[in-house]
Amino acid sequence: MNNTAKLALGAVAVVVAALLGITFLVPGGPSIGGPGPSNEASLAPEPTPTALRASVGEGRLEPGTYVSHPLASNPLLAVTFTVPDGWYAFDDSTLVPLGEGFEGPDGAVLAFLEISDVYSDPCESLGDPDVDAGATAEDLADAFSAQPAYEASVTDLTLDGYSGKQVEFQLPSEFDASCPRDEYFVFGGGPYPQGPDNRWHLTILDVDGSRLVIFTHDFAGTPASRQADLESMIASIEIEIEIED
């Protein structure tokens, strides 16, 4: 393993990885064995049929409108967004571009996350996160900006009528090889950096008592078309609290 940290995508991603012949890293698990999914037909499942508000699910996505339910604490919170051509879903809340994958120097990711706590030292992340991040968008943004291990700039924003914070991270260009497992966790459960100079963009929203984190990452080498895809998906987002049956 080199000292470049890898992305934790959860147990569902491991299942998808088995289908693709790729090994993904989850906390405490083995390292990634290769890049993200490619456009090779032999490596990707059949495209998911386009449907209005189809669940994101897993596999290669046809362009269209999809819905994700990313919060375990509030499963009725629904995020609807439009996916352009050339994207693959690892699970209900994590998308990567076909071809580039998620690693540097040209990868990208869109994910919907639930973050409760952060690490004061991302290099010492074997235990639970040690900094409480409160319950609001401002609380989490303040927790990030207070940590000296990385640079995080915070601005106010509104998305689909919900107010929150935009946090831009510039992560270290190199990670200390003495980090346990060569990993660098900013918050519990991943994701974590995919290569030197990985750029993170977090949109943190207060949504009717819940906190939703919309996470994207890219690199200087990420194609402009993929960066435009990320921007268009975020711009298309509509958030609602569904009525329980």
PLM region descriptions:
Residues 119, 123-140, 147-149:
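Structured domain cores in non-transmembrane regions
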Residues 47-49, 124-131, 172-177:
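A broad, low-specificity signal for short, low-complexity segments enriched in glycine/proline
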Residues 125-127, 165, 179-184, 226-231:
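Surface-exposed beta-strand edges and their flanking turn/coil or helix-capping segments
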Residues 137-203:
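Signature of long, low-cysteine stretches enriched in small and polar/charged residues
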Residues 127-131, 154-156, 217-224:
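Second-shell loop/turn segments in exported
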Residues 2-111, 115-116, 120-123, 192-197, ...:
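N-terminal targeting sequences that direct proteins away from the cytosol to non-cytosolic compartments
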Residues 94, 130, 186:
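Cys/His-rich zinc-coordinating "finger/knuckle" motifs
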